[in-house]
Amino acid sequence: MSKLRVMSLFSGIGAFEAALRNIGVDYELIGFSEIDKYAIKSYCAIHNVSETLNVGDISKAKKDNIPYFDLLTSGFPCPTFSVAGGRDGMEYKCSNCSHEHLITYEDYKKGVKCPKCEAVSKAKDERGTLFFETALLAEEKKPKFVILENVKGLINSGNGQVLRIISETMNNIGYRIDLELLNSKFFNVPQNRERVYIIGIREDLVENEQWVVGQKRNDVLSKGKKRLQEINIKSFNFKWPLQDTVTKRLREILEDFVDEKYYLNEEKTKKLVEQLGTAPLQKQEVREPLMVGHVDLKGHDAIKRVYSPEGLSPTLTTMGGGHREPKIAEKQKEVRAVLTPEREEKRQNGRRFKENGEPAFTVNTIDRHGVAIGEYPKYKIRKLSPLECWRLQAFDDEDFEKAFAAGISNSQLYKQAGNSITVSVLESIFQELIHTYVNKESE
C-alpha cells in the first residue's frame, strides 16, 4: 500500500488526521465531512486542504460520488449517548401512538415504522442515528478499516442495546470488531477523559477470535464485551495500548502568562482564596482531577469547581461560555522592580524597590536594573485558556496558531477542543493498526 487513503466523517478539527501526521503515516485524504463552518475553517487551516474536499452533511451527500478509501474514521455525535444528553441514542417515537422504540440498521435503510401501530416513527434526536450513515458508507465502499469513537455512556445506552445494534451492524456489513475504553490521562495529557474506541477490520483480512477479557476486569467495558460474546459477535483481539501510568500534571501544559481576562474577579473568588491561604495546594502524586473548592458563580455545580494544577483537568466539554471552562487555582508570583539587584544593601536617597505590579524605574546610564521575584501565599482563580484546552487534547501549538490565524474566535476554539478527540490516544491506536494490519497488507 503506497498511501493510506482516508475518509473522515464528523471531522471536527481533524484529530485522526493529526495523529496520522504525527506518527509519520503517508496518507491521502479522499474527503471529509463536517457541517460546522468554524470547524471547517480550522480543519482546512490545520491540515492545509481545500474546502472542496468537504462533502458536507454525510446524510445528504451522494455516497456513490465518493472515491474508494482504505480507512474510514468516524467520531459520530456523542451527546445523545451521554448522561448529560439524556441518552436518547437511537430511539424513535411514533407520530401516532407515541410509542418509543430502538431501531436497527435495516429499519434505518427501509424507513422506520412503529412496531405497535405501523405508523411513521421519527428520531427523538437525529444525531443519535448518524452511526448508521457511517455504516451506509462503509457498506458501499468496503474500506479495509473503520475506527469509531464515542463517549463511555454509549456502552450502556439503551441498557446495552445500542452497543449491540452497532456491533451487529458492523458484523452484518462485513467487519469483525474489537473495542476498548481508553482514558486520555494515560496518554501524556493531564485530562481525565474516558472514551470508547471501536475498530472494525474487514472480515477477509482478519481471523475470527473470541475476545480475551481479563478475569480481574469488572468494569463497564468488560461487562459490555461479555454481553456481546453471548450473542456471538464476530470479533478479533486488537493489541490495545497499556493504561498504567499518568505522566503529566495540569501545571505542565499551562501557559507562562495569560491575559487578565481569563481571571475571575475577586468578588467571586474571595472565599476560596482565603481558604487556600490557610491550606495551600499539595504536591502529592495525583492520578485524578483534584478539586480544591468552589467559586461564587450562578449555575450548575460543575461550573463553580476549581481544580489544582497539581492534578488533572476534568473532561473538556464544548464549554460555550457562561464560565463553563475548567478553572484552576494559580499561585501568584510577586514581581518588583529593583535598583542594583546584585547588592544586598545600597545607601541612597529615594526608593530602591517598587511595589508588585508597579512600572519599573526609568532606565539611565548609572544604575543597574532588575526584578526581585518571590512567591507569596496568595492565589488567583482563572479559566484555562483556549490554547491550554487544545494542549489537553494533544494538539500541537502550531495547530492552534493556524486555527487562530484563520480568524476563529475564543468561544469557537474552546468548543473545537471540547468536541475533539485526544490526538495522543489516536497515535497509540494507529501505531498498532499500521504496524500489525496496514503494513501486513503492503507485503
Curated annotation (Swiss-Prot):
Reaction catalysed by this enzyme: a 2'-deoxycytidine in DNA + S-adenosyl-L-methionine = a 5-methyl-2'-deoxycytidine in DNA + S-adenosyl-L-homocysteine + H(+)
Gene Ontology molecular function, alphabetical: DNA (cytosine-5-)-methyltransferase activity; DNA binding
Entry superkingdom: Viruses
Keyword DNA-binding: yes
InterPro entries, alphabetized: C5-MTase (IPR050750), C5_DNA_meth_AS (IPR018117), C5_MeTfrase (IPR001525), C5_meth_CS (IPR031303), SAM-dependent_MTases_sf (IPR029063)
UniProt xrefs under Pfam families: DNA_methylase
SAM-dependent MTase C5-type domain residues: 4-440
Entry annotated with the keyword DNA-binding: yes
Keywords assigned by UniProt, alphabetized: DNA-binding, Host-virus interaction, Inhibition of host innate immune response by virus, Methyltransferase, Restriction-modification system evasion by virus, S-adenosyl-L-methionine, Transferase, Viral immunoevasion
One GO biological process term: symbiont-mediated suppression of host innate immune response
Protein EC: 2.1.1.37
Active-site residues per Swiss-Prot or TrEMBL entry: 78
Family membership: Belongs to the class I-like SAM-binding methyltransferase superfamily. C5-methyltransferase family.
Described purpose of this protein according to its UniProt entry: Modification confers resistance against restriction enzymes that recognize these sequences.
NCBIfam families: dcm (TIGR00675)
UniProt protein name: Orphan methyltransferase M.Phi3TI
Organism expressing this protein natively: Bacillus phage phi3T (Bacteriophage phi-3T)
Lineage: Viruses, Duplodnaviria, Heunggongvirae, Uroviricota, Caudoviricetes
